[in-house]
């Protein structure tokens, strides 16, 4: 016996509006940063004793992973993002829209991934602007897309614990 396919309205694909919202907000903020802030440490804006706005280019991935390479990493991370986006969209098409937790998590990851892919393809780098620090230690700069990817991933991990506890 086969399962009845979900319509677009019934499936989690309905939650892709959130991915679009994340993408638009991410690109909009990055454009404001690029148009209104000087590049680099000397042009940082001190906001709080532990937080700066800082316009920098990231040629790698999270934590500037592989940023010192010759440029091939740009296409590797773009390819990974396309595969992940396709996979998550497929999973959303199989999930009922009422399963909000996972659909929201997937949409947050998709929106962030597409935002960073846009930067990589259009600029050749990802724009980062959030700089948190404690004393002289600075966490690697990041952006809204990175934040939504991490929140979505954390939601998926937490969901694994929720389901595990529910089976006890």
Swiss-Prot record:
Q: Which EC class is this protein assigned?
A: hydrolase
Task: Please write the reaction equations for the catalytic activity of this protein.
Answer: Release of signal peptides from bacterial membrane prolipoproteins. Hydrolyzes -Xaa-Yaa-Zaa-|-(S,diacylglyceryl)Cys-, in which Xaa is hydrophobic (preferably Leu), and Yaa (Ala or Ser) and Zaa (Gly or Ala) have small, neutral side chains
Q: What is this protein called?
A: Lipoprotein signal peptidase
Pfam families, A to Z: Peptidase_A8
Question: Which is an annotated GO molecular function term of this record?
Answer: aspartic-type endopeptidase activity
| The protein's Enzyme Commission number | 3.4.23.36
Keyword Flavoprotein among record annotations: no
Task: Give its localization.
Answer: Cell inner membrane
